[in-house]
Amino acid sequence: MPLILLPAVDVVEGRAVRLVQGKAGSQTEYGSAVDAALGWQRDGAEWIHLVDLDAAFGRGSNHELLAEVVGKLDVQVELSGGIRDDESLAAALATGCARVNVGTAALENPQWCARVIGEHGDQVAVGLDVQIIDGEHRLRGRGWETDGGDLWDVLERLDSEGCSRFVVTDITKDGTLGGPNLDLLAGVADRTDAPVIASGGVSSLDDLRAIATLTHRGVEGAIVGKALYARRFTLPQALAAVRD
């Protein structure tokens, strides 16, 4: 199977934006979220990674807009941002998305997370946002503001609970065009049988080709954001590169 590419549409107040290292206020705006998502579909995307940054930072929600985006797309949507309890999970799934990403709640409310993994199976992925500090792999929550414990301990717990998929971000790379952390991706993939999706740092077609070399180890896909918006390459070029 070729590497699956998921163009990212990060939403703030209804607009598509990109942040640098997830920092609120660091965004560059790229227009309407609906237009951005439809544009990636038109360019050949099979999946869209749709993120409600207002919900992730706890400052509101773009729920109605997200539902509109999902409704207008013919492709699969992975929805992320602020999914922390039964109400927000139900609202996210009600948009018609194919799956949701749970992040902070997997760290702060492990019992709830274990239950929804059990109830929803393949519809729930867990986002692992990793910061490497003095050689230690620490997880970050609440829009990357809080410490969420040791990556390998949390991964072992979630894996034992049957988590169906992990979305792995090296947050020092996200939005920087600094290249992906291949060692981190391989390390996670080697410790779980669940598929892994890479996020953060992709800057070139060679970066995507490098991630694609990890598919046999369990890396299933890559989320691509800033590189596409900054026109480092087009989505058709990226799709062709990982199919070579």
From Swiss-Prot:
One of its GO terms (molecular function) is 1-(5-phosphoribosyl)-5-[(5-phosphoribosylamino)methylideneamino]imidazole-4-carboxamide isomerase activity. It comes from the Bacteria. GO terms for biological process: L-histidine biosynthetic process; L-tryptophan biosynthetic process. Pathway: Amino-acid biosynthesis; L-histidine biosynthesis; L-histidine from 5-phospho-alpha-D-ribose 1-diphosphate: step 4/9; Amino-acid biosynthesis; L-tryptophan biosynthesis; L-tryptophan from chorismate: step 3/5. GO terms for cellular component: cytoplasm. Keywords: Amino-acid biosynthesis, Aromatic amino acid biosynthesis, Cytoplasm, Histidine biosynthesis, Isomerase, Tryptophan biosynthesis. Involved in both the histidine and tryptophan biosynthetic pathways. The gene is priA. Belongs to the HisA/HisF family. It catalyses: 1-(5-phospho-beta-D-ribosyl)-5-[(5-phospho-beta-D-ribosylamino)methylideneamino]imidazole-4-carboxamide = 5-[(5-phospho-1-deoxy-D-ribulos-1-ylimino)methylamino]-1-(5-phospho-beta-D-ribosyl)imidazole-4-carboxamide; N-(5-phospho-beta-D-ribosyl)anthranilate = 1-(2-carboxyphenylamino)-1-deoxy-D-ribulose 5-phosphate. NCBIfam families: hisA-trpF (TIGR01919). It comes from Mycobacterium tuberculosis (strain ATCC 25618 / H37Rv). Pfam families: His_biosynth. The active site is at 10 (proton acceptor), 129 (proton donor). PANTHER family: 1-(5-PHOSPHORIBOSYL)-5-[(5-PHOSPHORIBOSYLAMINO)METHYLIDENEAMINO] IMIDAZOLE-4-CARBOXAMIDE ISOMERASE. This is Phosphoribosyl isomerase A. It is found in: Cytoplasm. CDD domains: HisA.
